[in-house]
Curated annotation (Swiss-Prot):
Residues 32-56 are annotated as: Disordered. GO terms for cellular component: membrane. This is Transmembrane protein 41A-A. It is found in: Membrane. Belongs to the TMEM41 family. It is a multi-pass membrane protein. The chain crosses the membrane at residues 84-104, 107-127, 170-190, 197-217, 236-256. It comes from Danio rerio. The keyword Transmembrane helix applies. Residues 34-47 have a biased composition (Basic and acidic residues).
Amino acid sequence: MRSLVGLVAVIVTATFYLYSLSVFLPPGPQLHKQSHEGETTDAKDGDEPSEMETASSRLKFPSDLDELKEMAELLQFYKTEHTGYVLLLFCSAYLYKQAFAIPGSSFLNILAGALFGTWFGLLLTCVLTTVGATLCFLLSQAFGKHHIVKLFPDKVAMLQKKVEENRSSLFFFLLFLRFFPMSPNWFLNMTSPILNIPVTLFFMAVFIGLMPYNFICVQTGSMLSQISSLDDLFSWSVVLKLLLTACVALLPGALIRKYSTRHLHLDGLETNGLSQNKKNR
């Protein structure tokens, strides 16, 4: 009971912090509107509600591509004068999702590509993914170990058996689980402290193992921000970027799978129900 109270307190505190960031926004860039004489004048009090006046009501986790596009446009608007605040808001929202195992990080990865570009967006999402997963690890270690075992006894037992079988190659086993596209990352994050996986090993496996997945999402966001029509989608530059993305994403996984077939004991991972849909990653 005490562990549940502690977890609820952490969730409430984090939610209040994130809500405060989204509501008490700094003033956005000065808006202008066209007068009847053709001159540009500043928007004044009493005018129709501007974009920045309704911004707080539009800041929410995107659940589809339309909401994602609207969110990207709004944050790009604020980013022109408040880059630091937008970065703080994005990082806070990302860590909130990861720490509490909330699905939908792919949308935030795409948003990172649209806001910050491919390379900075990739570095940012890799760091945030790793830190957020580690926070989930620590929360599970502090508050949830007993409840997770109670809720998922068979899956925990099966994963515990596989970890012990691959203890001599534990890092590569963890990399395999992260590269494997159907592995539920939220479940791996929460069960790792139960399996006695060292936090440093966990940290490195998440950072490296989810890098290809993050790269695909960030590159998609970066490309979408540059595409204005369907014709742009089939340009040579876009096609080459897609091919490069596919190669970079598939190569590490192929190498790990080749290693795993020779050195790791993986029988039963899929048949015991560990695999799940990609959207729950």
